[in-house]
């Protein structure tokens, strides 16, 4: 359970949900991300687990910090939304 909380926090930060709040419409909660990326340093263990689960993807090349840039897939957005009880739009919609 502790690890799941860590993954939820990483995913929330990736889409900016740690800075912006969801909105309510027709008594349901929604969130429209203003971003969907997370640049890591060398420690990528949490993100690699989410990639293996199909919830995230990453660039093939390392970034300037020695890590990778990750983003949530549609499956990852749906998983996070289920965990938080909100519908998360894809920022490309």
Question: Where are the model-predicted features located?
Answer:
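Short amphipathic alpha-helical interaction segments
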Residues: 36-58, 67
């Amino acid at each position: 359970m502790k690890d799941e909380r860590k993954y939820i926090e990483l995913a929330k930060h990736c889409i900016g949900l740690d800075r912006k709040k969801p909105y309510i419409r027709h008594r349901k909660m929604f969130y429209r991300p203003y971003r969907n990326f997370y640049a890591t340093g060398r420690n990528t263990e949490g993100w690699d687990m989410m990639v293996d689960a199909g919830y995230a993807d990453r660039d093939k090349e390392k970034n300037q910090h020695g890590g990778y840039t990750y983003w949530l897939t549609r499956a990852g957005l749906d998983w996070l939304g289920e965990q938080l009880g909100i519908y998360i739009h894809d920022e490309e919609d």
